[in-house]
Structures are given as C-alpha cells and as structure tokens.
C-alpha cells in the first residue's frame, strides 16, 4: 500500500485511481469487517477529492450515518463535521469510509459492535484490538492509507499493536474533541493509526491544534513535527522493568531485543518499576464509567437515533435504552451511575481522582530525568475471540495503556517483532505532555532499528 507521505504528492488523477483501488479492495475484503457501511452509501464525493483517510464510526462527518457502532444511533445522520474532519479537508485529505469499533468505544476487541466483529488481518481467529479495531485492521490489511481513531484507555495503541500498525495518542487537549461521540470526556483523544511513524506524524500534524469549539482543547502553541523528525537523536529512555517482566514470554523477548537495539544505537537506557499500578485499572474504570453514565444519558430515543415503541414517555426512555444499548455499554452505565450515587461518590469517585493524581505524578517524576518511557502496549499479542469472556479479565488486559490516559500524556505504539503465530508485538513509548516531537523522534529511531 502506498504511504500517506507518498500519496500527498499524487496528482488529482492518481488520487482518483487510489480511491478506486481502495474501494475495490474493501469490497473484496468485506468479510474482514473493517468498515461498517458500503462506500456507495456515503456522501464521499461531496467531501472533496483529497487523499482518502478512514474514519472511526464515532467521529462526525456531515451527511454520513454515524452510529458509534450502536443500535441506539441507527438512522442518525451527522449534521456537521467534527473539527478534525474540517482540518483534514483543508490539508488535501478526505474522509473515506466508516470503520468498525466497539460500541461507544467501550471494549478492546470490536466484539461489542452492533455490526459484528472485525477480524485481525494477521490471523482471523484473533481479535484486532479495540475500540478502534476497524481503523487498525483497515490500515494493516491495505484497505486504508491511514485512519483516525480515538483513545480513551488504549483504543488507538492496542489495536495498532495487535494489527502491526503505528498508533499515536496525542497529549490530552492537543487534538479537538468537537464532533467526537463522547465516552469519557476527561480521557478521550482522537489520533492517527498509520503504516509507519512518519505517516502517523503527518496525520497528527493535520488534525492537531487549538479549537475554541472544544472546551477541553488546550490553547498551547502547536508546531509541526513531521518535518523535523530526527531518528538519530540520542535520548534518555526509562524502561518500566516490572511491566516488561510481567508480559508473556514471546512479548518479553521481543521487547528486550528492542531495548538492546536502543542501547546499541547510543540511547541511554535505565530501569525502574511502577510500584502502585494495582490502583490503575480500578481508578480508570471508576472515572471512565462515571463520565460515560453522564455522556450517554442523552441517548433516550427522543432527540435522535432509534426510537422504540412505547405507550408513554417513561416507556419510551426505558425501551429505547434497553433495546438500543448492548450488554457491555449497559454494564458500564450501571457501574458509572453506581459510583456517582449518594453514599458512594466519596468512597469511589473521589478516591479514584486522588489515585489519578498520584499516577500522573509518578509519570512526571520519571520524565523529569528522562526523555521517554518504554513499556509494553499489552501483556501479550492479540488473543483469540472469546478468550476474555469475563469482563474483569478483559479490563485487566488494559493495564499498560490506561494509566497514560489518566496522566494525559502522549504515547505511541511501534511494532518491534512477531510471535510464533505471526502476531505482532509492539513497544509503547511515552513522553512529557506536549512533547510529541521527542516521542516521534524516539519512535522513528526504534522503527529504523527494528527494520534494520
């Protein structure tokens, strides 16, 4: 597949041919489930003829049906463009197809999608990751030049790692959330999934920057990073030793080999442990579900989306939500409502926010003395469908990504090897807030070393 950097140099005729080639591939690979709607049903022609970018199904594109992979939003057509879409259109990039996801971005496998699951292009028996599994699968399978996803607790980095792509989660507030279907407003962040580090940086540049329409967008000066990538710059990298040691044997072997290559290239590598990580999962799921409970209260069958049959207003609310939401979404709404209820708010939510502050301080302390943090993206490579049928087991698999969202830091997943089933292993690099340049420099160095 042509890279994003190459495609941006194409003539209008070459871009037209690329779009036709992608459309033919998408139809041929329909069983992969990377996309959720036939391209013919989308108003692609009205959105410009730029380089095609796949869009996760929770990002508003004017004239498109946007459902967050949920039955409750059946029939909803976006009346406006998200800010990231407007930015794409101004940079000779254009939306090209809706990618599958876990319902309302709640999951790590795409199995909770109303449209059905997406398959991992590397091995169809294994999950592609989530919640941006469709975006990652599309890029990995050559069905997209690059894609946009959203990351609340690893939803860009984990599927990118499982499918063998590069996934970048920007600093919280760096990319506008205006037009994103909200899951957890203090954690959500839109970012790119791409074939390589340079393409990820190019797409990041296209969507980043302050947006007055988004109250969570930070008014921090933005400077392009893709034209200043330096993979030869020597960096101080701190490895989270206990995270690497606790990964599966094949994941650990690939990560340790990557660490040795970083050392041999002249990077300064030190080791430390995260001592209090036992609170990460609990803090994340308390905060995320509490915010989800509030955000998803707007879906009631009255204003937009699917409306259930009912005899009165109460039945309309109950039936629309009961029939429209999937089991995982219902579970998280219930949990979030519980932790916000009288008598439990102080016991759970306030404590979770204190744990969040502690997690952020722990990251900041390490990054005071280092340029980057190195750790796994996931404890193992992509697991088989149904392997994590227990919700708690599934939540625990997010252990290496969720704390980065709690801290609001930028992070990237970079492929570093394969296991004996040809499944991808990725390393995760984390940088100081607003320092995506150092993050990309380190990722490019690692990518170069792995590719040789």
From Swiss-Prot:
Biological process (GO) annotations held by this record are: translation
Q: Which InterPro entries match?
A: Amidase (IPR000120), Amidase_CS (IPR020556), Amidase_dom (IPR023631), AS_sf (IPR036928), GatA (IPR004412)
The catalytic activity of this protein is classed by the Enzyme Commission as 6.3.5.7
Q: Which domain of life is it from?
A: Bacteria
Q: Which GO terms describe its molecular function?
A: ATP binding; glutaminyl-tRNA synthase (glutamine-hydrolyzing) activity
Q: Cellular component GO terms, alphabetically?
A: glutamyl-tRNA(Gln) amidotransferase complex
Tell me what reaction this enzyme catalyses: L-glutamyl-tRNA(Gln) + L-glutamine + ATP + H2O = L-glutaminyl-tRNA(Gln) + L-glutamate + ADP + phosphate + H(+)
Looking up Pfam families in the UniProt record yields: Amidase
What's the stated role of this polypeptide?
Answer: Allows the formation of correctly charged Gln-tRNA(Gln) through the transamidation of misacylated Glu-tRNA(Gln) in organisms which lack glutaminyl-tRNA synthetase. The reaction takes place in the presence of glutamine and ATP through an activated gamma-phospho-Glu-tRNA(Gln).
Concerning its family, UniProt says: Belongs to the amidase family. GatA subfamily.
Q: How does it assemble?
A: Heterotrimer of A, B and C subunits.
Q: What is this protein called?
A: Glutamyl-tRNA(Gln) amidotransferase subunit A
The taxonomy runs: Bacteria, Pseudomonadati, Campylobacterota, Epsilonproteobacteria, Campylobacterales
């Amino acid at each position: 597949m042509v890279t994003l950097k190459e495609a941006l140099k194409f003539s209008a005729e070459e871009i037209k041919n690329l779009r036709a080639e992608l459309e033919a591939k998408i139809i041929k690979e329909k069983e992969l489930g990377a996309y959720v709607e036939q391209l013919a049903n989308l108003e692609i022609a009205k959105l410009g003829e730029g380089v095609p970018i796949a869009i996760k199904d929770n990002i508003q594109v004017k004239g498109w049906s946007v459902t967050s992979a949920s039955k409750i939003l059946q029939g909803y057509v976006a009346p406006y463009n998200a800010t990231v879409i407007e930015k794409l259109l101004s940079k000779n990039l254009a939306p090209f197809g809706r990618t599958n996801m876990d319902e309302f971005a709640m999951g790590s496998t795409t199995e909770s999608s109303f449209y059905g699951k997406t398959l991992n292009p590397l091995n169809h028996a294994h999950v592609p990751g989530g919640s941006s599994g469709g975006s990652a699968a599309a890029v990995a399978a050559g069905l997209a030049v690059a894609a946009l996803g959203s990351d609340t607790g690893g939803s860009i980095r984990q599927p990118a790692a499982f499918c063998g792509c590069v996934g970048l989660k920007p600093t919280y507030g760096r990319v506008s959330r205006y037009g994103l279907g909200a899951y957890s407003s203090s954690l959500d962040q839109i970012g790119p999934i791409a074939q390589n580090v340079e393409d990820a940086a190019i797409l990041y540049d296209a969507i980043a920057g302050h947006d007055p329409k988004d109250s969570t967008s930070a008014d921090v000066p933005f400077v392009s990073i893709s034209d200043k990538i330096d993979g030869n710059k020597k960096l101080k990298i701190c490895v989270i030793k206990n995270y690497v040691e606790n990964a599966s044997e094949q994941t650990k072997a690939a990560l340790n080999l990557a660490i040795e290559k970083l050392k041999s290239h002249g990077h300064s590598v030190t080791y430390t442990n995260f001592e209090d990580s036992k609170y990460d999962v609990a803090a994340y799921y308390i905060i995320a579900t509490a915010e989800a409970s509030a955000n998803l209260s707007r879906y009631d069958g009255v204003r937009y989306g699917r409306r259930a049959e009912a005899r009165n207003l109460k039945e309309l609310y109950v039936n629309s939500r009961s029939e429209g939401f999937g089991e995982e979404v219902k579970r998280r709404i219930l949990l979030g409502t519980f932790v916000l209820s009288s008598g439990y708010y102080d016991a759970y939510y306030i404590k979770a926010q204190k744990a969040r502050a502690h997690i952020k301080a722990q990251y900041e302390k390490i990054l005071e003395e280092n340029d980057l943090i190195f750790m796994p993206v996931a404890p193992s490579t992509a697991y088989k469908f149904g392997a994590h049928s227990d919700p708690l087991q599934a939540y625990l698999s997010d252990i290496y990504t969720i704390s980065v969202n709690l801290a609001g830091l930028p992070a990237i997943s970079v492929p570093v090897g394969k296991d004996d089933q040809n499944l991808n292993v990725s390393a995760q690099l984390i940088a100081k807030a607003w320092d995506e340049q150092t993050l990309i420099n380190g990722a490019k160095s690692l990518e170069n070393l792995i590719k040789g």
